[in-house]
């Protein structure tokens, strides 16, 4: 099985990255802060004003290491990568399937909604006794209604737009009770629904930051198996949007991101002071809080779970690659359907 390599995250403004032999070296104010062998690196993600030497860029391209440039708040700016490992026959099959995407869309939605529902079920099982009666009832109602949506989608022969509508309904139910899964006494983490571009409260800021990291991993997974990350099935084409990466992210984010965010908040590893509010209302993680989240994200990706289709254990960080591989096998005709990743 593919080995889970390290992602190097650089969050400190003014850091310089260079190549020394077969190593990536990070320096700040002339002092070496880190050294990692290139053969242990899968990708490099840098935030804000970081200098990356041309020599390191060339070495990363030669080793198949992608460099992702984000601005200081985590918005995507650019990617630096070597030749894309594309297979023209696979991509033709992908483009053809995108014209009639219903079967793949159905599988993606079944995976996403099942995993969202599993997150609610786990929260009710672990903490239901602490929920006020009205909150517990609301979560149970969402669980029941999501089960109905799963049955409806599973039996549906409708077009992709109708399937997307069911996915949107499930998302509304899920995020409608997500705030009740937050057990921190800190009122600043109160969650009243998703807000994006920009996030307007600490919980949304944390979710958006983690979703950015997962999107990067899913995009890299698509490219590593030869798929075009820009052409999706659940997400429609839009210039500049990695639609297929977003497709793969949907079924994974309830488990990889949402549960991690809840853990960081409920265990009080993050406090209200770990966030800053900008003019205009946007809320962002502080630099130190970002390091806390990145460390937890790396540890989360090392945790192993049994893959329901492959029937073997794999680190969570490899699941995007495994799902991209399953999709490629389906598009080639080796699998009758795309098998979603279900969390149990």
UniProtKB/Swiss-Prot annotation:
Which domain of life does the UniProt lineage start with? Bacteria
Q: Which HAMAP family match?
A: Cas1
Signal peptide span per the entry?
A: none
The Swiss-Prot or TrEMBL record annotates one GO molecular function as: DNA binding
| EC id | 3.1.-.-
Name under which the protein is recorded: CRISPR-associated endonuclease Cas1 2
What keywords is this UniProt entry annotated with? Antiviral defense, DNA-binding, Endonuclease, Hydrolase, Magnesium, Manganese, Metal-binding, Nuclease
Name the positions where Mn(2+) binds.
167, 235, 250
């Amino acid at each position: 099985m593919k080995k889970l390599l390290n992602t190097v995250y650089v969050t400190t403004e003014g850091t310089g990255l260079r190549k020394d032999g077969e190593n990536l070296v990070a320096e700040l104010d002339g002092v070496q802060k880190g050294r990692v062998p290139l053969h242990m690196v899968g990708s490099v993600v840098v935030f804000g004003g970081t200098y990356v030497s041309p020599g390191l860029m060339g070495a990363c391209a030669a080793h198949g290491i992608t460099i992702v440039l984000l601005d200081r708040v985590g918005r995507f700016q650019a990617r630096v990568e070597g030749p894309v490992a594309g297979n023209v026959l696979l991509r033709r099959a992908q483009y053809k399937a995108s014209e009639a995407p219903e079967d793949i869309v159905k599988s993606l939605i079944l995976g996403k909604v099942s995993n969202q529902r599993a997150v609610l079920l786990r929260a009710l099982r672990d903490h239901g006794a602490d929920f006020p009666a009205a909150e517990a009832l609301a979560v149970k109602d969402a669980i029941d209604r999501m089960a109905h949506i799963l049955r409806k989608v599973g039996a549906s022969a409708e077009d992709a737009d109708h399937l997307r509508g069911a996915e949107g309904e499930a998302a509304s139910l899920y995020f409608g009770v997500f705030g009740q899964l937050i057990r921190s006494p800190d009122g600043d983490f109160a969650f009243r629904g998703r807000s994006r571009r920009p996030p307007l409260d600490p919980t949304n800021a944390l979710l958006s930051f983690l979703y950015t990291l997962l999107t990067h991993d899913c995009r890299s997974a698509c490219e590593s198996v030869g798929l075009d990350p820009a052409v999706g099935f659940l997400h429609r084409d839009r210039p500049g949007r990695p639609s297929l990466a977003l497709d793969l992210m949907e079924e994974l984010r309830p488990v990889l991101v949402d549960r991690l965010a809840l853990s960081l908040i409920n265990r009080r590893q993050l406090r209200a002071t770990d966030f800053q509010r900008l003019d205009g209302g946007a809320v962002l993680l502080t630099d130190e809080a970002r390091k806390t989240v990145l460390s937890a994200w790396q540890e989360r990706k090392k945790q192993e779970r049994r893959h329901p289709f492959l029937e073997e254990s794999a680190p969570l960080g490899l699941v995007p690659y495994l799902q991209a591989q399953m999709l490629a096998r389906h598009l080639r005709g080796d699998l009758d359907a795309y098998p979603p990743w279900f969390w149990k």
